[in-house]
């Protein structure tokens, strides 16, 4: 019996109790919450449903809880139920009911934990979207890990997810990039507002390999040559780095296309139709303050050139016209103002601001022995995705970046995350999977097969804890997806790995020496098979490997 099954049983029982005592059944919440009590002595699960209902139906909470408990004790799978405190209900499950989660996991396999929670949603998930003027920095690397994990997570809950990279190839930063390449190709100092680092010299040299006469072209043509080839080379490197990191995108949208295809003009025309555009001081303004922004925004400047927000407006409209009912933007710590801005833009178009969600990521710092890690010589000013992967590997890099809530700054200790120790969270989880895999191989050599026919034998305290943690997996995924918090998967896996290690240390799974195999051995093998599957499923959502050997 999973927590979801138990919640449904509680709801059904409470409905019957309310009806029996002529109380209002409509007062029942849509979802009844069951939780694991902090003190295991209080039972396997607890619920406050009687406390929730009592005031609404005019009943004494302890009395109402008592009626529910009396009915629950007659239900299949309930070993005991009791009233605690002002009206809490504490429950213990029969071992056979609790162990049904093992069957559920083995039957579902890689689909265990999946649901149709978000099946009605077509989601555009835009993340990283770094300018093609340099390698992916550590902040963008955090989004590469978290965004990819979030996409996988939403997909497990039935969402139709499209991962999108918005290619910022329009604007002054691209011109500065081209000027930096030209200076490097000529052997001149980097312009004051240019980009520095050995990667600039590398790309400049490669531009000259592709266009040997580039420096002899007229200035405008030379600039365009370095701009076009340089951006293409830089973005190819970015995509290669992301791919090796395990992050790929379904769609790459060029910012420049919003302007060249007339999408910006179409967006402005639509806003004129809604009456949310006006002219002032020779510029065209969006009435964004009418929709929650702190001020109105210039869309077309007085020199008739589009402001940066013009591309954002066109891009949002483009997403909606492609059928996305949820547009998630994952932005850096310096983009807090974009939350109100993007929602105001949606409202100004006459769209639901709820179609826009903005996640803001905080800073990432690398440390070793408590000291900040110095900047990359290759890039001159930033630590890159490639630097982090070189230091600790892809799995540790992804896990370390996903493990904390995105609104929390994080310090990544390179010594810790590269260590083969239980203090390293990703090692701890992966080792549990490798240990389970070794156990399965050893069992096969002994001719033992996991057996789910005698799961009622799993009555040891540590087995019960492990079973309850396994039962939490589906609702953990639902919560993580609903809250857009893939870090919950990491924390769950660490709890599950810990519960497994403690179970393994207390409960012998395989017979030793001349000991004859028993039904308990094969039941425990089934429990281990289910645990291994749950860990593999969780690591898969994170884009982290589940090793067979370590």
Swiss-Prot record:
Annotated keywords: Aminoacyl-tRNA synthetase, ATP-binding, Cytoplasm, Ligase, Nucleotide-binding, Protein biosynthesis
GO MF term set: arginine-tRNA ligase activity; ATP binding
Sequence motif: 'HIGH' region, positions: 130-140
Keyword Membrane: no
PROSITE patterns in alphabetical order: AA_TRNA_LIGASE_I
Intracellular or extracellular location(s): Cytoplasm
EC assignment: 6.1.1.19
Assembly and interaction partners: Monomer.
Name used for this protein in its record: Arginine--tRNA ligase
The species this protein was found in: Mycobacterium ulcerans (strain Agy99)
Lineage, broadest ranks: Bacteria, Bacillati, Actinomycetota, Actinomycetes, Mycobacteriales
